[in-house]
Amino acid sequence: MATLQIPSALLRSFLLMFCLFVIPSLSSDSDPLQDFCVGDLKASASINGFPCKSAVSASDFFYSGLGGPLDTSNPNGVTVAPANVLTFPGLNTLGISMNNVELAPGGVNPPHLHPRATEVGTVIEGSVFVGFLSTNNTLFSKVLNAGEAFVIPRGLVHFQWNVGQVKARMITAFNSQLPGAVVLPSTLFGSKPEIPNAVLTRAFRTDDTTVQNLKSKFAV
């Protein structure tokens, strides 16, 4: 039986494409090329974060913003205090960040997604209903109590809801120094410039009055 022979040039091309496109996709942020690179936030960001500060100290690797309490007196009853490269420059190029999330009783961190990172959240206080949606519209959810954790795959829509009678607090961690957040309600109904009403009425199978009412709630 004849054996299929793959031309060596074609094989080399395939291996090159694999190295260029598949291997980098296994990580989120790029790997650092030095021990650390404390971000100079006064400079413009580049592809892999901020340029390095010329002089650093222990204070650059310290952050005190993960404590509480936070003010949750807003329509959603939630406040998120991020510890990412923009607030904690020592994280620059290290591929990690955290959030301090506090929810009032009944408070909701509305459906959102992080385009650049996987998230793992741990409840510190209270009881939080956490859920994410897969690409086939399946809801995966769990009520978390103190000391319990839940992972949210990268780029999937998810939310947190305080189902307890007292405040709840979570610490969330990401495999990116700046995971980004697309909050669906404010993105769809509070964008600048606005998404045309005709698009939203058709997408949500509703009428122009309802869409305009929703837009008014997210107008800045």
From Swiss-Prot:
Signal peptide bounds: 1-27
Compartment(s): Secreted, Extracellular space, Apoplast
Residue positions the entry lists as glycosylated: 136
Keywords (A to Z) from UniProt: Apoplast, Disulfide bond, Glycoprotein, Manganese, Metal-binding, Secreted, Signal
Positions that bind Mn(2+): 112, 114, 119, 158
Disulphide bond pairs: 19-37
GO MF annotation terms: manganese ion binding
Family membership: Belongs to the germin family.
Subunit structure: Oligomer (believed to be a pentamer but probably hexamer).
Function: May play a role in plant defense. Probably has no oxalate oxidase activity even if the active site is conserved.
Protein name: Germin-like protein subfamily T member 1
Species per Swiss-Prot/TrEMBL record: Arabidopsis thaliana
Taxonomic path: Eukaryota, Viridiplantae, Streptophyta, Embryophyta, Tracheophyta
